[in-house]
Amino acid sequence: MKVLVLSGRFGMGHEMAANAICEQFRKLDKDTEIVKKDLLEELYPHISKLIFGGFRLMVEHCHGIYNFIYKMSGKMKVEMQPRGAAIYKKLKKILEKEQPDVIVCTHPMCVKAIASYKEKTGLSTPLVTCITDISMHPEWKADQTDLYLAPTREIKEHLICEGTKAENILVTGIPVRQQFLNMDRNHLENEKKVRKVLVMGGGLGLMPDLRRLLGKLHSMQSVQTIVITGKNHKMYEEWVNRYEDVKVLGYTENISKYMRWADLVITKA
């Protein structure tokens, strides 16, 4: 069997969910061939970095505008999807090259692109939509989806109310990598009775009120803090040597290690 996993680097959550799916497929069946692609990079190779950069600037500096656009696009049911003859031609090239037995999408842009292609061409390859947001947005819904992987029972009920058959929905939670599945803290006993706080804002390090938060944590006795700034290099440079009891780290793949270490995790929604 061959599985094609499609995602997009709009934030790191969708990408990490795709990585987790690939990891689990390999664990379940070593003979399964897994191919993971960033669909935006495949469709728009010359401007994908510009698009990702613009997205990052918006969520870092204009998150209020981004949230407004996100909510309004849901209410107005505005579809933002790659379409057109040139896009279909590129999708056809990808699918003919890979010849997948199943397609798994962890970003709504990918869902819409593949669903539209299936509708136009009659492609019979099953489409699995893995919803990697904790709230439902209309962009995730596509009639051409054969199976939904829902993060919560509430989202399953929402899909059913929208007309999706219950047997086409599995409540799986958001996929996580193997390292998160065994969060044993027994070997990390806190002998000094220091309270340990982990602060992180996802892969992009989105933490707008960090000055106030770290100032408050620094003022508390017996509190040790680790801040993970992700790929936000500016934030890392600003805080890396600010407080002795606050350790600042950049992007890391080993998040589970620091979650096991912490007594409290403060992060974005």
Where are these regions (language model features)?
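Active-site-proximal region of nucleotide-activated glycan assembly enzymes
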Residues: K120-Q179
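Conserved N-terminal ligand/cofactor-binding loop architecture of enzyme catalytic domains
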Residues: A20, Q24-K92
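Glycosyltransferases and closely related glycan-assembly transferases
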Residues: K89-I103, K112-V128
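Donor-nucleotide binding loops and adjacent catalytic segments primarily
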Residues: E191-W261
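Alpha-helix C-terminal capping/helix-to-coil transition sites in glycosyltransferase folds
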Residues: Q99, D143-Q144, R260-W261
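A short helix/loop element that forms part of the nucleotide-sugar donor recognition site in Leloir-type
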Residues: L181-K193
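Acidic donor-binding loop of glycosyltransferase active sites
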Residues: R260-A269
